[in-house]
Design a protein with these regions (language model features):
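Acidic donor-binding loop at a coil-to-helix junction in glycosyltransferase catalytic cores
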Residues: 212-218
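Short aromatic/hydrophobic "clamp" motif used to bind/position activated sugar donors
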Residues: 129
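Conserved donor NDP-sugar-binding/catalytic core segment of glycosyltransferases
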Residues: 141-169
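Glycine-rich, basic loop-to-helix element that forms the pyrophosphate-binding segment
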Residues: 108-124
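Acidic donor-binding segment of Leloir-type glycosyltransferases
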Residues: 72-108
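Short, well-formed alpha-helical segments that are part of the catalytic scaffolds
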Residues: 58-77
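Hydrophobic helical membrane-anchoring modules
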Residues: 37-50, 220-283
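Conserved nucleotide-sugar donor-binding
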Residues: 125-126, 191-204
Length: 283
C-alpha cells in the first residue's frame, strides 16, 4: 500500500510518520480470526483475542450480485469485520451464512438502503465504518488505507475515487465528474465507498435511515464536521445502469433526482419513482 495517498484533506494532511509506523504495526499484529457470528438481532460484543477491532465494513444487499462472493473474499481479514445487511423478504444473494468467513456477520433489516446501512452501523464494533455496495471491486488498496487510518482514531469521514466498469466510453467521464464534484463539494455518492469515524456519525444522530438519497443526506450533515478525506485511491463498480437504461438518459435522470431532492422532494417519493421501474431491482 502506498502511504502518500492521503490527499485532499480538509484541515491538513495526517502525519505521514504515524501512517508508516502504524502500517508496520498492523502488518506485524495481523492474525486469523475464528469468530463466526451469523445472526439476525444481537451482535457478538467480544473477540477471541484482546486485539482491538480496527474497521467495520457494512454491505447492504437486496438481490443477487455476481461479484458478491468475490467482495467478501477480498474483505476477509482478521482486523476488520464485515456486516452484510440483507433486505428482509428478498431473494438470497448467493452465499449461505454457514459458508461465510469468520469475520462476516449476516443480519436482516427492512428493505431500505439507508435503513439497512443504519442497522449495520448499529451492529458495528469498529470505530471506523466503511460502507460498500455489493458490486464494488478492487477494494484491496482502499481496505489497507482504512486499516491504517482506523488506528489513528481521528474524527474523519470521506470517500474514495470511483471507477465505472463497462464498455461505454462516457463512463470514464462520468466517474471523473463524480470524483471532482465530491472533492469540491463534499457531497458524495455511495458508490464511492464512503467511510466515517463513529464519533463523527454520532454528532449528526447516526446514519440516516431513509430509503433513497441517504448518501447525499449524510454528506450534507457531515460537511464541516471532522476532516473530509478524498484519497486518490480507486474502487470500481458496475456501470451497468448507464448501459442498460441508456447513457445520456441515465445521466439526466440522476442529475434530475438529485436536483429534486435538493429542492425538497422527499426520499420516499423519489424511491417509489426509482424502484417503480422493474429493471432497477439491485440495491
Amino acid at each position: 500500500m502506498r502511504l502518500d495517498l492521503c490527499r485532499d484533506v480538509v484541515g491538513g494532511p495526517i502525519n505521514q510518520r504515524e501512517l508508516k509506523i502504524l502500517s508496520v504495526l498492523i502488518a506485524a499484529g495481523a492474525g486469523p480470526s475464528h469468530t463466526c457470528d451469523v445472526m439476525q438481532n444481537t451482535p457478538t460484543k467480544t473477540r477471541p483475542d484482546s486485539r482491538p477491532l480496527l474497521l467495520s465494513v457494512v454491505v447492504p444487499v437486496k438481490s443477487v450480485s455476481p461479484n458478491f462472493a468475490n467482495l467478501l473474499g477480498a474483505l476477509e481479514d482478521s482486523d476488520c469485520e464485515v456486516i452484510v445487511v440483507q433486505a428482509q423478504d428478498s431473494m438470497p444473494v448467493g452465499s449461505e451464512p454457514q459458508h461465510l468467513a469468520g469475520n462476516v456477520k449476516w443480519i436482516f433489516a427492512p428493505p431500505s438502503r439507508g435503513g439497512q446501512i443504519a442497522a449495520g452501523v448499529k451492529h458495528a464494533r469498529g470505530d471506523l465504518i466503511w460502507v460498500l455496495h455489493a458490486d464494488s471491486t478492487g477494494v484491496d488498496h482502499a481496505k489497507g488505507y482504512l486499516k491504517t487510518l482506523a488506528s489513528l482514531g481521528q474524527p474523519v469521514w470521506g470517500r474514495f475515487d470511483i471507477q465505472l466498469l463497462g464498455h461505454h466510453a462516457g463512463l470514464v467521464w462520468v466517474a471523473r465528474a463524480m470524483n471532482l464534484r465530491s472533492r469540491l463539494t463534499q457531497i458524495c455518492t455511495g458508490d464511492q465507498g464512503m467511510f466515517f469515524h463513529r464519533s463523527v456519525l454520532q454528532q449528526v444522530g447516526g446514519y440516516p435511515s431513509q430509503r433513497l438519497m441517504e448518501d447525499i443526506e449524510v454528506s450534507k450533515k457531515l460537511r464541516g464536521r471532522g476532516r473530509f478525506l478524498a484519497p486518490n485511491i480507486p474502487i470500481s463498480t458496475s456501470g451497468e445502469r448507464w448501459e442498460r437504461d441508456g447513457f445520456w438518459r441515465t445521466v439526466a435522470h440522476m442529475w434530475l433526482w438529485r436536483l429534486r431532492y435538493f429542492l425538497g422532494a422527499s426520499a420516499d417519493q423519489l424511491y417509489d419513482e426509482y424502484y417503480g421501474n422493474p429493471s432497477r431491482e439491485r440495491l
